[in-house]
UniProtKB/Swiss-Prot annotation:
Native organism taxonomy: Eukaryota, Fungi, Dikarya, Ascomycota, Pezizomycotina
Annotated Gene3D superfamilies: Ribosomal protein S17e-like
GO molecular function: structural constituent of ribosome
Function: Component of the ribosome, a large ribonucleoprotein complex responsible for the synthesis of proteins in the cell. The small ribosomal subunit (SSU) binds messenger RNAs (mRNAs) and translates the encoded message by selecting cognate aminoacyl-transfer RNA (tRNA) molecules. The large subunit (LSU) contains the ribosomal catalytic site termed the peptidyl transferase center (PTC), which catalyzes the formation of peptide bonds, thereby polymerizing the amino acids delivered by tRNAs into a polypeptide chain.
Protein name from the UniProt record: Small ribosomal subunit protein eS17
Organism listed in the record: Neurospora crassa (strain ATCC 24698 / 74-OR23-1A / CBS 708.71 / DSM 1257 / FGSC 987)
Length: 146
């Protein structure tokens, strides 16, 4: 069973990651030495807990942004995504379809009309509902005994 991490461990690991992100790695031993160098931590046990949680958070950061942790590299990446402009506009009907029209549903057509893009030729296609996939149940996927 897992252990509960104290507020001290979580806060200090978060601060260490925000300030020293480029130095940290996915290796506990390396992070432990870095924690030793950059912070005055009262006990060896507390240092190990902070280094362990730092390593855990670093692994989570590798998978994607982590709530509550913001560092320069992550902010730059977010800024780049916000400033993204596609090569070909989705509203450029000359390049997007063979028929010279956009294929949209009724809601999108209403939205385009509301935004003043009603001069764009559109082809309304009804939306089809995807069938929900039957997921297996736990306990060996046995059928229920009703």
């Amino acid at each position: 069973m897992g252990r509960v991490r104290t507020k001290t461990v979580k806060k200090s690991a978060k601060v260490i990651i925000e300030r020293y992100y480029p130095k940290l790695t996915l290796d506990f031993e390396t992070n432990k030495r870095i924690c030793d160098e950059i912070a005055i931590i009262a006990s060896k046990r507390l240092r190990n807990k902070i280094a362990g949680y730092t390593t855990h958070l670093m692994k989570r950061i590798q998978r994607g942004p982590v709530r509550g942790i913001s560092f320069k590299l992550q902010e730059e990446e977010r800024e780049r995504k916000d400033q993204y402009v596609p090569e070909v506009s989705a509203l450029d009907f000359t390049q997007n379809s063979e028929s010279g029209q956009l294929d949209v549903d009724t809601e999108t057509k209403d939205l385009l009309k509301h935004l003043g893009f009603d001069s764009i030729p559109v082809n309304v296609i009804p939306v089809t509902q995807a069938q929900p996939v039957e997921r297996g149940r736990r306990f060996g996927d046995r059928p229920r005994r009703d």
